[in-house]
Amino acid sequence: VMEGKNIVLTKQNEKASEIITAVQQENISVKGVVTDTKGEPIIGANVVEKGTTNGCITNIDGEFTLNTPTNATLVISFIGCQPVTIALNGQQTLNVQMQEEALSLETVVVTAMGIKKKAASLTYSTQQVGGDELTRAKDPNMINALAGKTAGVSITRNSSGLGGSAKVSIRGIRSANADGNNQPLYVIDGVPMLNNTSEQAFSAMGGNNDTGNRDSGDGISNLNPDDIESMSILKGASAAALYGSQAANGVILITTKKGKAGMQRITFSSNLTVDHAISLPEFQNRYGASGETSWGAENASMKAYDNVGDYFSNGVTATNSLSVTAGKEKMQTYFSYANTTAKGIVDVNKLQKHNITFRETASLFNDRLTLDANVNLMTQKIKNRPTSGGYYMNPLVGLYTFPRGEDLSVYRDNNGFEKYDENRSMPLQNWYTDISGFSQNPYWLTNRVTSNDKRFRTLASLSANLKINDWFSVQARGNVDYINDNYEQKMYAGTTADVAHQNGRYIKMNRQDFMVYGDFMAMFNKTWNDWSLNAAIGSSINTTKVNSLSLDSGKSG
């Protein structure tokens, strides 16, 4: 190199020469066919030069062509097959046969203690239902959505209309008493919840068993189905080890949704269902009325009125739900609001329910400490909940025994269910026969024997899990469950004397349930080669308090 009048000599860079030589290395065109163990071509297999992005996929005949250096290594992969690695060493034609890869997907379930375990390691039977199954056809009581989806679980709807309870039994009835409690224990995120079914005979309010029962619903119906991630049915004595005798009928474990790291999502869903009375008795239309227990003469020209069909209408349930999910690596948030508006198959039966849920999860100290806080608020109002069973207060008795060939609309339209009484200067019940416990106007019972149910519920829980090391951790959980029920019933003057005074009857009830639950657990999880040991020891405390107040004017004044 000439620099002015000087000649400068420099040593050649050997590394640069090597790089140039490598870059200038000759490429070859590699062709091949990829097949399975039966010789069938595999379409869409990935063929990639190892360590680079240079690659292609096989065509419909399993063939591929790829330009690559002579000493390259190819990796062939396809879903469901074991990857194949081939060092070319100058080869330009390949025949590749791929072996199927047997994948064993282990099912993970949540145990009664809220701990995730492999299903195969459990010593009791369990079944799991996803949240999507529960929200496909939304019911005011979400537990009804389990019907027919799990083996050995029987679910019976109560006949008390909107907001009524459901009777659930796992592996058969355990109580010989028809009124015995066969209900399972409901556990939300590892914490038991109140599920009192306030179904009681009107005898508690001065009547007798013939007046039927008042069903004020159950606790599980208060939850928002859209908040449920999954539901597991746990069977066997060991499934309920933590909760003692209260879980003797089995456990239904509910896992709720929570925020997820790196996800921001707003979800809105709306659902509308229509109910209709389809299982009605068949009525004869050949004989007229005679006495209360016999038919009259045959009348071929008797007009057939659809008095029973006219009494019922289409029930409509509308549910709207909005949820917001947001989260970062260390903290996640979940919020939801839902409202349910429903009208029963009897027009005066109506329901209004609101749910608010807020959940916050956090991981601290390099994920050694996990915190989880959850608050659920619910308000519910139900008007004119139908009576379950009996005949004094059951409108179906008067509806079904009304004379064939007569038009019941006379006792319905324009307040035809009541008639002004000159002697008492007030409207009283209007009916084709004497008013008695056995026979009352069904439209009087739906319009002049009214009721209102109101419920407010709060569920709040907090849990902390501290990971001491890779195989030992401790957990503490606490929960508060508060329910405030108010019930009011009015029986107007003119209602049968079997249940009401001649001037009517007024009933008001208040009940407050308060439960505090706490538990502490130490968990050991250690693996040695093919052996593993899982152990947990803990203790729980549960305190329940009930306050109730009843006011009743009675049937004797």
Protein language model features and the residues they cover:
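Transmembrane beta-barrel strand/turn architecture of Gram-negative outer membrane proteins
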Residues: 151-155, 167, 227-230, 247-274, ...
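Flexible glycine-/small-residue-rich
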Residues: 11-13, 34, 49-51, 68, ...
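Residues embedded in well-ordered regular secondary structure
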Residues: 119, 128, 149-152, 161-166, ...
